[in-house]
Structures are given as C-alpha cells and as structure tokens.
Amino acid sequence: MSYFKTAMLLAGLTALFMGIGYLIGGASGALIALVVAAAMNVFTYWNSDRMVLSMYGAQEVDVRSAPDLVRMVAELAGRAGLPMPRVFIMDNPQPNAFATGRNPENAAVAVTTGLMQQLSREELAGVIAHELAHVKNHDTLLMTITATIAGAISMVAQFGMFFGGNRENNNGPGLIGSLALMILAPLGAMLVQMAISRTREYAADEMGARICGQPMWLASALGRIDAAAHQVPNVEAERAPATAHMFIINPLSGQGMDNLFATHPSTQNRIAALQRLTGEIGGGGASIGRPAGPSPRGAPRSPWSGQPRARGPWG
C-alpha cells in the first residue's frame, strides 16, 4: 500500500472523528476532536506496543522460558534482515498471532498458546514469518493507529447518540443527519480498516513466504487457524473488536455480522495466492489440512523439524 493511500485513509478516519465531534459540540467540538485525534496518534506512536500487549495479557518470554520459539523468531528475523523483536505469548486457546511496535527496532511478535499447541513447527514458522513481514513493511504502527482511531470513533459515536448530539441542530433534517452520521461513522471506520487490512495481508503473506522459503507452511497454518477461529472464541478480541484486523486471521470471523465487514481477505483466496507463489519460490512445504506434527517424509523440512515437537507452549 502506498504511503499516499495510507495517509488518505488515516485522514478519512480523522475526518469521521471530527464529524462526530461537530455533531456533539458544533465547531468547538470538531476542533476538540481534531486535537484529541492528534494527541491519540502521538500517544499511540510511543505506546502502541504496550497498549495492545497489555490488552491481551501478553507475557514476554526469552530463550530460557521459551527456547524453541525465541530461537525460531531469531532465525527468521535474521533471514528477513530485521533486528530481533521482543517475543510474547498470550494465554488464549484460539490459535492466532499479531505483531506490533512503532518501527522494526521496537517491534514485538505475540502468539497465543493455542497457536503453539495446535500448529506444527513448519506452520508456526510460516506464521512468524508473516508477522515479521508486517514489521519489515512498517505495517505494525499503522495497524495500531487505525485500531485506536476506529475504536475512538465508535466510542464517541455511542456517546453522541446517548446525549443526543448538538442540541442546536436537534430539529428536522439536523437531527436525522446527526443520527445517521453517528450510526454510519463506525461502519465507515470499519470499511477503512478493511481497505488497509486486505492490502497489507496479501503483501505480508507473500513476503512471509519468501522469508521462510516455503509458501505452503503459511498456507497450511492459515487453513488451520481459520477453522479454529470459527470454533474457539477469543474473549479479549470480543471486548476490543477494533483490534481484530491486527491478527493474522480475524479472531471474530465466526461471529455473525463480523463476516459482513471482514477485516481480512478470504482465507481461501490467501491460500490460493500462496499456492501460486509456490511455483515461483519452489518447494511444496506442508500439505494443507494435515495434522500438526513433524513434516511428512519427502516434504521440505525446517531447521526446527529435527527436534521432537514441544509438549507445551513454553518449550
């Protein structure tokens, strides 16, 4: 995604925020909303990683507490030409992962316990390579800023509906227009998230496949995570749906209306794109849908396949 398009999308989110402010407090409300949006962006720039990681109860690990995971991240970060990010684990049964941080020097990769327990080493490597691709593409800051502003738009819109908006406009079309904008603004914010997310996910899939060297490792992981997301709820994501687009697979994808406003491209389309990429990069990797565990005989193996599979998320 070009920097110009990204800037325009973020400007659109800010304009929605100002529009809600205007409906609540007139011109002064719009000005306050602009100042608040600017302050939020500055605050998010410096605190984005701590905010999101704290929200999901992520715990930082090192080579002593999670040696296999940390070594895998270090190996893949080296292949990607990135500094070593901090590594976190979230105690959550849904297999999923995200990356955050304002730049590659201050990045973090977080995975759930469900991801480590349900995926093979090769699939896990594909997921981590995908998240490192987000870091390399500088997507991590954009994802967090978008989530922050979109969440604020929803919150302020609900506040405006509760208090009835700007009372000077509370008759005739003014009231109808105010209510319409307060209802539609959060939907508009979701559409902006979709526009950003769809493009960056395809790009991260391709770069992640190149980093790990086997597109089918990531393709297999995507299929497994997508199936689990329809069955295993992510309670923290339910409480903060504006952060759903940060994950490799939408953690809300099995929940009603979220399918109509999906923040991610179709998983099947992503898998198909990775299958096409296999011919260019070479190697078939793991077959989609196979049980988690070591690579089958004859399939390309990762540097981590020679060791026994870890029994828990910390090994």
Swiss-Prot record:
Compositional bias ranges of the Low complexity kind: 288-303
Record region (Disordered): 282-315
Upper classification of the organism: Bacteria, Pseudomonadati, Pseudomonadota, Alphaproteobacteria, Hyphomicrobiales
UniProt keyword annotation of Hydrolase present: yes
CC terms in the record's Gene Ontology section: plasma membrane
Gene: htpX
Known cofactor(s): Zn(2+)
Listed Pfam families: Peptidase_M48
Statement: the UniProt record of this protein carries the keyword Protease: yes
Residues engaged in binding Zn(2+): 130, 134, 201
EC number: 3.4.24.-
Localization: Cell inner membrane
GO biological process, alphabetically ordered: proteolysis
Protein name: Protease HtpX homolog
UniProt cofactor note: Binds 1 zinc ion per subunit.
Active-site annotation: 131
Organism listed in the record: Rhodopseudomonas palustris (strain BisB5)
A GO molecular function held by the record: zinc ion binding
Keywords: Cell inner membrane, Cell membrane, Hydrolase, Membrane, Metal-binding, Metalloprotease, Protease, Transmembrane, Transmembrane helix, Zinc
Family per similarity comment: Belongs to the peptidase M48B family.
Record-linked InterPro entries: HtpX_protease, Pept_M48_protease_HtpX, Peptidase_M48
Domain of life: Bacteria
Parts of the chain that traverse the membrane: 16-36, 145-165, 172-192
Topology of the protein relative to the lipid bilayer: Multi-pass membrane protein
